[in-house]
Amino acid sequence: MRILVTNDDGIQSKGIIILAELLSEEHDVFVVAPDKERSATGHSITIHVPLWIKKVFISERVVAYSTTGTPADCVKLAYNVIMDKKVDLIVSGVNRGPNMGMDILYSGTVSGAMEGAMMNIPSIAISSANYESPDFEGAARFLIDFLKEFDFSLLDPFTMLNINVPAGEIKGWKFTRQSRRRWNDYFEERVSPFGEKYYWMMGEVIEDDDRDDVDYKAVREGYVSITPIHPFLTNERCLKKLREVYD
């Protein structure tokens, strides 16, 4: 396959280098990734300033470019400019840390894959779910094995897979729902060396979903969480209720 690999941790991150190297043993791999970390940029794109592309070296088997854009920009540039619209699969990652629950709305990693899904190209976001001790190689090797078994024709149009891999021994994988996992944010007030006040965002994770088949519970139990997601955000049940009342 011709595989496009991107991420939000940047072109020099260990996660993308390990993933690209291992995928290139069996596939034609193109890396197009941000020239610096773009974590938590969501699905932003660049429209008011130029985008620059620079060829970089990762290995002999991998064609790689850095860009000044976001992960979504990288996918657009790769598809339309670098790869001449010949892409069989898009993989975004391996991210350092989980992308579960409401994280996916902020995640540049997920948005890179979602951009592919919006083009109706098979797309996967993959994350090593332990931020402090990420196992990039373990996640990459899981993905390689998964690609040999998974039938992408089972996915609905414009649908991608969000994969979170636990560190350590993997018991198996589970298809999961996106959880209600979220953050309680607060801001720590600090003072610069120049005496100027500034704020640093902090947060505490909230994991109180009462459903059993959600992403973070699978990861906590040692399973890879695989969640099919899409860009369409309409709450169908609420829409039906509103129409019944107001139409």
Curated annotation (Swiss-Prot):
UniProt: a divalent metal cation binding residues: D8, D9, S39, N95
Cofactor(s) essential for the protein: a divalent metal cation
Keywords of the record: Cytoplasm, Hydrolase, Metal-binding, Nucleotide-binding
Family note: Belongs to the SurE nucleotidase family.
EC class: hydrolase
Cellular localisation: Cytoplasm
GO molecular function, one term: 5'-nucleotidase activity
Source organism (scientific name): Thermotoga petrophila (strain ATCC BAA-488 / DSM 13995 / JCM 10881 / RKU-1)
The protein's name in its UniProt record: 5'-nucleotidase SurE
Reaction catalyzed: a ribonucleoside 5'-phosphate + H2O = a ribonucleoside + phosphate
Cofactor note: Binds 1 divalent metal cation per subunit.
Primary localization: cytoplasm
Record-level GO cellular component terms: cytoplasm
PANTHER family xref list: 5'-NUCLEOTIDASE SURE, 5'_3'-NUCLEOTIDASE SURE
Entry keyword annotation includes Nucleotide-binding: yes
Function: Nucleotidase that shows phosphatase activity on nucleoside 5'-monophosphates.
Domain of life: Bacteria
Enzyme Commission number: 3.1.3.5
Matches recorded under SUPFAM superfamilies: SurE-like
